[in-house]
Amino acid sequence: MSPKERIIMGVDPGTILMGYGMLHVAGNTPRLMAMGVIRLEKFDNHYIRLKRIFDRITGLIDEFLPDEMAIEAPFFGKNVQSMLKLGRAQGVAMAAALARDIPITEYAPMRIKQAITGNGNASKEQVAGMLQRYLRIPDEQMLPEMDATDGLAAAVCHFFQTSGPMARSGGSAVKNWKDFVNRNPDKVR
């Protein structure tokens, strides 16, 4: 790969379905490499799901060799247990990237939607449709699970935030555990 080429892995954390997308960037031209979902519904035990997330994210990293990871931040809901589980799933995906020294940038869901559609309150369908048009994804490659396009959206958002003359200062890249702990003392003890 030339110095101006990179691969961005996007992740939409989840405890039932976790979406991912791989984006190859050459210069200022992004191209879809892959997108999909990690299915976790068949595992009753939450800890087994976390292990599966780690194993699958690590496998995807080993297969596609991404240079960077963009991950959607958990949204704040009313159900504390759901938030805890989602945060754990996100943390395990981040740990897999950090174990391979892949820098991570986290983006809020509204920021991703804003970057893709121009509307921070866009629906999942609107995000998927815009990604399909922008990346020229054939209908047969689109998946019924919107988690896959949500993962891809994180990667495309990161591309927009870091590439070309329109790049704006965006999320904060975390290069290793020490960096993460220093930036987030309230999240660790």
Curated annotation (Swiss-Prot):
Single annotated GO MF? DNA binding
Cross-referenced Pfam families: RuvC
EC number(s): the record gives 3.1.21.10
Subcellular location(s) per record: Cytoplasm
The record places the active site at: D12, E72, D147
Q: How is the cofactor bound?
A: Binds 2 Mg(2+) ion per subunit.
Report if keyword Magnesium is assigned: yes
Q: What cofactor(s) does the depicted protein rely on?
A: Mg(2+)
Protein name per its UniProtKB record = Crossover junction endodeoxyribonuclease RuvC
Identify the coding gene. ruvC
